[in-house]
Every structure is written in C-alpha cells, then in structure tokens.
Amino acid sequence: LQDLLGLLLLFLMAFYVFYPLLFKNKAIFLRDYHFITYPFRYFLSQAFHQGIIPYWTPHGFSGMPFMAAFHPGVFYPPSVVFFLPDTLLAINLFYFIHFLVLGSFLYLLGKLWGLSFVARLCSSVTGMLSGFIVAATLTSNFFLGAVWLPIVFWMYLKYRQEKRIGYFIGTVLAIATQTLAACPEISIMTLVLLYAHCLWFMSKEEGRAGYARMTASLGLAVVLALGISALQLWPTAALMEHSTRSGGMSYEIHTMWSLEPHTLATLVLTPVYIVEAGSGAYPGFFWGGFLHTLYMGILSLVFISTGFFFCRNKAIGFWLLVFLLGIWLALGRNNPLYEYVYHSIPLLELFRFPAKFFFVSSFAAVFLTGFVLDALLNHTEKRRLTIYPVVTVLILLLALVVWVGLNQPYLGMENSLIFLFIFGFAYILFYFGKIRKIVFTTLVLLLIIVDLNLKDFRLLPLIDRKFYEERPVLADALKDAYGKHRVYSGRIQQSSFSTLLPASNSLDGMLLLKQYLTPFTGMVYGIENASGKAGLGMGISKQVIWVAAMKQADADGRLRILKRSNVGYWIDPNGENPLDSNGDPVISPDRIRVFKDALPRAYLVPGVWLAKDSQWLNAYYAEAFDPLQHVLLSEPVEFAPSNHFEGKVEEVSYRPNHVTVKTSQEGTGFLVLVDSYFPGWTVTVDGKEEKILRANYFYRAVQLGPGEHTLEFDYFPEGFKEGLIVSAFFLLILIALPLCKPFKRVPLPRSVPFPPDPGESP
C-alpha cells in the first residue's frame, strides 16, 4: 500500500507538471525542440498514419535517409503514440510517459537499495524535476536515453538478486529500448556505470567466479539487446560509412560543447523566470551551452556536500566518486587532462559534446539525495553525528549562494536562501527532538518539490499550440512548389554566411525561424529545403560538402549553386520584419525571390562528361558548364550520342520512399533527377531494373534510349534486410529463454549495505 501511495504521488506530480500540455493547449518549443523534435515527430506521425515506414524524407538536403539516421526513433517503442491522430497531443503524451517512467523506476530502484519511503520520494522527485532533465528535454534524444538508466539498473540488479529469467529478459528489453532512443553515448555510459556499480558492491564470498558470472550475464544481455536492435543499428552502421564521423572527429570538434566553468554556477542557482510565450514573463534570455542549467535543487546540493561526512558508506562513497568524475569529464577542453582521455578511450572520438558526461553526475546527485538523507536521519537519531558538520555545510552553502547571486544577478538567490534557512531550522529542531522524524522528512520532501517546481520545470518553455498549427504566410505562397522546386532560406549576399536567421533563442528568434521556413521547420508544411542540419544526418559527407561549398562561394557562386540544386525560391532574410496585431514578426511573400532559371526537378540531357573526384564539384558549379546539355559522371558508360536529340519529362510524382518519372525522347540521353544520390535507391525503366548513376556529384541519372519511358525509383535502406533477419533471430532466442533450464538461484547479499553498520561513523 505504501508503494502504491508513493507511485500515485509521483503520477500526480507528473500530471501536475504536464497539465498545461495535456489540457490547456500548450506545447513545448525553443531550441532543438522547435526545429528538430517537432518536425521529425510530425513527419514520423504522418508516415505512421499512411501505414508506411519512413525510410526517406525529401525535406532536407535534396532528400536524405530518415529511418537510418537513428535520431528520428522510427523503431523506438514509445513512438507508437504517434499513431494518434493529434501529433501535438501525441508528443505531449510521449514526454509525459517518459517523465512518469523515470520517476516510477527511480522509486523502485530506491526501494531495491533499501531507502526509506520518503528518501525514495525525494530521489524520484529530484530526478523528475531536476535541471538536467528539463535542459535535456530540449535536446530530445539525450533526454530519451537518460530516462532508461533507472530501468536498466533495476531490472539487472533484480536479476542479480533473485536470478529470475523474467528480470534478465527485462534487462535485455530495457537496454534495447535505451539503444533505440538514439543517444548511443548515454547507452554506453549507462552500461559502464552499471558494470562499475556491480563491481563496487561485489561481495567477497562471490569470488572470481562471481565476477565472471556477472560479466558474462551483463555481456549476454548487451549482445541480445544489440541483436534485437539490429533492424535499426545495421542500416545506421551502413549510413555511417557515408559520414564524416566514420573515422572519428577531431579533438576541436569533439570538445565543441564542453561544460564551461561559469556554468557550474547553475549547480547552486538557476534563473527564476517563467519561460512561457504570451505570459509577459519571457525575458529573451537563454543560458548558452549544451545544457542551459545543471540545477539539481539546493537541498540536493546540501545532501551531496553532507555526503562527504558519510563517504565510508559504500553507496555514498560510490556515488560521490561518480558525481565528481562526471563533472571532471564534462569540462572537456576546460580540463587540462581531457585530451589524454580523448586519445585513450576507444570510440570516444565518434561522439560530440563532453557536457553530456554530466548525465552520470546528475543521476549520482539523484541517488545521493536519498542515500545521504537516510544516513543523516540514522546518524542523528543514534547520535553518531554531532550537529556541527551539518551546520558548517549550511553556513558554507549560504555563503556560496550569496556569492554566486551577487556575481550572477540573473540567477535568483532569494528562494534558495529561504529554503536553506528553513531546512537548517527544521534540522536543528529535529536534532534536539523538538519535531518528529516524519515531520522533518515531509518538510524536506515539500521543500524539494517547491524548489524544483519554482526553479527548474518553469524553465521548460511553453507556447500555445497554435504556434505549430498556424501555417506561416510563406508556406501558403509556396504550396505549389512541392515536387517541382526546392526552397532555400538564408543569407547569400553577406560575406558572413549563415543558414539560420536570426541566430537567437529568444521568442522573436523562434518565430522568425518558423516564418523563414528554415530547416527543418518547413518539414511540417511540405517544404523541400535544399539545405539542412548536417549533424542530424549523422554528418553525411555530401551534406557537409554542400554546406561548405555555399560557405566558400561568393554571392554569384551561391546563386549558381542554389539554381543548380533545383532551388526555385529563395527566402531573403534581410530587411525589417513587420509585426502583426499580436506583436509577432511576420514575413510577407515579397521576401520570396523566384529563380526562373533554376534547374527543373528532372530533365533530359544529350551528352555526358567524365570528371575526376577532385574536379567534379568545381566542374559542376563552374559558370561555363551547362547542366542542361551534359551530365557529369565519375564512371565511364557505354554511350553513343545521337545526331539528333529531343525529349522532355512528362511527369514527376512522389510517394513515400518512391518517385515516378515519365519521359519521351528521340535519341539516346540521360535522365537527370535532382534528388540526392544514395545507396539503397533502385530504379526500373519500363519494368526492367537499370543502374542509377551518380550525377553532378550529388544527384541521380539514368541512361535512356529513344521512346517513351516510365521510371520507378524506390528506396530501401542498406542493411535493413540484414538487420531484420538478425533482429528476428535474437528475438526468437529471447522468447525461447524461459523454456530453457531455470537458472540456479543463488541468494546474494543486498547490493547496497544500508543502513550503515553500527560501527560506521562519519
């Protein structure tokens, strides 16, 4: 009954937090959520409604892989909510479910570790409403991966404790789900942390055989989870072969978003404003960096600091080490020893942003909140702790809050000072027996809830859902462009090239990004953009090269690149932006520049030139080259040009993962389709399979003879068939596991020695 009450309280907490999203027509916006999360989930939802798997999207970089890119989470199990007809409601439910799952399994994990009822609730609330989780929500996949750590821990530790096959299967499924959440660095950190935790708490009685069994069982769970996930991982691995990341990233790129030392101030204080558009409280301020706040609660900081007096407790000592190690690694380039770490740890160069290491510190803070609270209560009641260490910690934290607040005026310190005084006064009363333990612990829980609700979750920016539902003016003006010409939004004339305008996280900035239909916001409105964000396509080489070509070219060169990329419409961001009656910026249709001489989506050419890789791109964008007369290929073909050539493209039509082109011509020539060339595309000409040639560096061509032709292009990702077979094989193994001989149950001691032994002292 107590556990049901605890889980009900966590449900009510999550319900309270998400009430505006579920019942008041609010939606999350800002940063990645605005121009990545919502457009990608919307596209996925529309594909599900059509009953197809979205292998490909035409809405960025002249078409790019969608499913294999990993980030969209096509096979991520919670994505089933996107079968709901209301995409915004589905997204809000999607996040509500994740918050609820996070809090529930933090509670269950606390129970497994022997924490008291209130300590479990304090840890769970800290995890659900922490600044890390709020900040990670705006980066989507980072948040989705983080949620699964307590589930992976709980499942595997329950298996270790009870040796029930059901918990082992649960471990496999939890690891697989976290893997499919598409943040591999989080998955790796979770497994490394779990393995380290098991080693730390391994009893001497288990000996070497116990180490071997633990290593083998966790290793087997990982192998089975990766096997089940192969339907996603195999095509993603095939896509990686075309990525600039396949050989690893340089130290400079890898450490681009390191945790800045000044950001550590948000461990103590965090901005106090409400980020809600239309509330009048939106200040236009955004904390820079990968995570805009690290705040875990002022009481969490109290417990972390007090934890050093209990470091002989095995659990507290472990999580203190993890907390410090996570911050040390998160500093990245600001850590003088990090470059040695970068060169020493295998595969680390494949990932970006050392700030992500704060993930382990955040969960360490969550667990320390519960462990230290119980240790403090235990030692206080048994008088194994004097009042002076706690008072000293509180005085030092009060001084730290004042110092940070005075030096960082945008970080409000008033509430933190009040909470510290209330906690200190209550602890003194509890220490001298003036209030009962239940009163003190209940007050601690309430302080944590109020503190995190005031300071952290209110930083999750909300806006009315009409922000996403109302079409930009330019989207209506471009409604006939789909399948014919692409759109480009960004500077051309300026020497400082930028595809995103304005480079701001303010409310006006977000509204302008939507009005300008910048990548990938136009995905929602059926806009096919010639550009995009190369990082979301896993740094596909051709995408990076296209962006680099635009950056390096002069104004005339950029115009030529756009026209030869089938860009018929350029949205010019320069000039003043008028405001509507609500004070929101509106971009009028006169901002659209029409390129009447842009290449059509598909056309026929009579001639062919061969180009070397080193000259291919320069030749295509050269002013002297006429793309309507010749196609540039890198491989020789048997081709006899006709004395007379005439032809036209009769029709170009698109369906998901499919393009149909109908042509008629006299003489031999080539169809050029200005859609991205990518392995996985196949074509039939009049029902007979033919070869797709890589044309003009980026696009596709098919050699055709005289007559009328129907070309059917289909996309099926490389490695998907093999991945399906592997996933099916490992899934059958998992299903068969319960039929195998039961595991011999060997009772193990509790994984965490809590409460502390009587002889233990701070």
For the regions a language model picked out, list residue spans one by one:
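Membrane-embedded helix bundles of polyisoprenyl
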Residues: L10-M13, G103-L112, F117-S203, S217-T236, ...
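Selective detector of the "anchor" transmembrane alpha-helix that sits immediately C-terminal
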Residues: L8, F96-L108, L112, Y295-F309, ...
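Membrane-interface coil-to-helix junctions
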Residues: F11-F105, V125-V147, E241-H242, G247, ...
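Membrane-interface anchor segments at the N-terminal boundary of transmembrane helices
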Residues: A281-V302, Q408-E414, E646, V652
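Active-site-proximal, structured, solvent-exposed surfaces of multi-pass membrane proteins
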Residues: V302, W328, D556, G568, ...
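Contiguous transmembrane helix-bundle modules in multi-pass membrane proteins
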Residues: T139-V147, Y159-V172, A176, I186, ...
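Extracytoplasmic
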Residues: E414, L446, V450, L454-H644, ...
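Hydrophobic alpha-helical membrane-insertion signals
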Residues: Q2-P65, A237-S246, V302, F467, ...
